[in-house]
Amino acid sequence: MSFSVDVLANIAIELQRGIGHQDRFQRLITTLRQVLECDASALLRYDSRQFIPLAIDGLAKDVLGRRFALEGHPRLEAIARAGDVVRFPADSELPDPYDGLIPGQESLKVHACVGLPLFAGQNLIGALTLDGMQPDQFDVFSDEELRLIAALAAGALSNALLIEQLESQNMMPGDATPFEAVKQTQMIGLSPGMTQLKKEIEIVAASDLNVLISGETGTGKELVAKAIHEASPRAVNPLVYLNCAALPESVAESELFGHVKGAFTGAISNRSGKFEMADNGTLFLDEIGELSLALQAKLLRVLQYGDIQRVGDDRSLRVDVRVLAATNRDLREEVLAGRFRADLFHRLSVFPLSVPPLRERGDDVILLAGYFCEQCRLRLGLSRVVLSAGARNLLQHYSFPGNVRELEHAIHRAVVLSRATRSGDEVILEAQHFAFPEVTLPPPEAAAVPVVKQNLREATEAFQRETIRQALAQNHHNWAACARMLETDVANLHRLAKRLGLKD
């Protein structure tokens, strides 16, 4: 088989139709899956010895949240090293990163796999992966044809990365010195709320404004602070963290501003405070609403004049520090109640950011679950950690009052429980592995009244075909076991499968 000019033109056109990079990438992947007739396809970006999914088709949604470290995925490492088309034999001993992640085929191993590394010049920037359930699925395509596909995808990805870099530079102040690239914190989520938050982070990071980050406990406010710092001109300098809620009143001032020897009992030497440590960098004050009014006044002075005084010292020290503050309180209410200074609130909230709670982020919960599943897989040395359909349904309908932190702990606990109930190094997370309070789940989709588009015979055959497929998937394509599950004779099952087009 060879690609026609029309096929290649269609791929190129799809790359131009999208409004944004994400839309273009999704169109590319969807078109490729149709053209190559594969069961699953993915476009991955390469960054710091890991592949990050940008768009997928035919794979479970949680794949978008996973981060595939090369040391944990030998097939992806082989693709990264190859420099050309990589075809993995059906009996390859290297585990496929997508085993168990093709919906409806969770219990089956991927058979056919092709990897296409994507380059910009001599630099690896990403990869295309194509997977199929049949061992010879991609034999009809030559390496040269697959290289054409890779070239189109590489061009699209390279242009997107270049535009992203230029847009980031254009947001920098005109007199800012270009800074060395720093590994960026990954903020996982494609919901409207997270997309807007990422845009706001990109805008404010390039400035030197103080930022107030608000959000419920466990939403990831510290991660937002890291993302702001890493995308700022101060990225090569320190990001210093201080949890104001954990500060005893007796040492709070010393922690912030430092002290000199003999300033108080126990001050046996001079000590720098967090502001000095963060000089020319960023200071992140977590739970700032917990600071006393007296300390708020001293913090305000630093923000106004840029100088500090160590405890026990009359001299002032100049510091150049950007302050990022976070709170899970409504500071406006705290101001009205007299527990927080209005002038400090206005100094801090020049550019306020609000981190949405997990219950308002829709399918982001599945992406984050995928991320934590992959983390657990690497930490525990497992071959795979997969979410069942029931587990995904449960996660999507639980409110998560503890937000992302609660989800992380729930995934880790579920992996440990699942691992204890089955042998081997493969873990499938079921709904019963999650100890959530009662969750009201919607009725199964099958309970909905379908729109009739077939006659009775066609509908019956479609139902039989899907039932046999699911039974085969659950029994690793063992026809005898499948027949036992369906309570039918194996010979009759073979004849029915042939009539339904499931067997040659």
From Swiss-Prot:
Q: Name one GO biological process term.
A: phosphorelay signal transduction system
Q: Which residues bind ATP?
A: 215-222, 278-287
4-aspartylphosphate carried by residues: 57
Give the domain of life. Answer: Bacteria
Please list the residue ranges annotated as the Sigma-54 factor interaction domain: 187-416
The UniProt annotation gives the DNA-binding region as: 479-498
Enumerate the Pfam families for this protein: GAF (PF01590), Sigma54_activat (PF00158)
- Name the CDD domains for this protein: AAA (cd00009)
SUPFAM superfamilies, per the entry: GAF domain-like (SSF55781), Homeodomain-like (SSF46689), P-loop containing nucleoside triphosphate hydrolases (SSF52540)
Which keywords belong to this entry?
ATP-binding, DNA-binding, Nucleotide-binding, Phosphoprotein, Transcription, Transcription regulation
Q: Its Gene Ontology molecular function terms?
A: ATP binding; ATP hydrolysis activity; DNA binding; DNA-binding transcription factor activity
Q: In which pathway does it act?
A: Nitrogen metabolism; nitric oxide reduction
Q: What does this protein do?
A: Required for the expression of anaerobic nitric oxide (NO) reductase, acts as a transcriptional activator for at least the norVW operon. Activation also requires sigma-54.
**HAMAP family documented for this protein:** NorR
Write down what this protein is called: Anaerobic nitric oxide reductase transcription regulator NorR
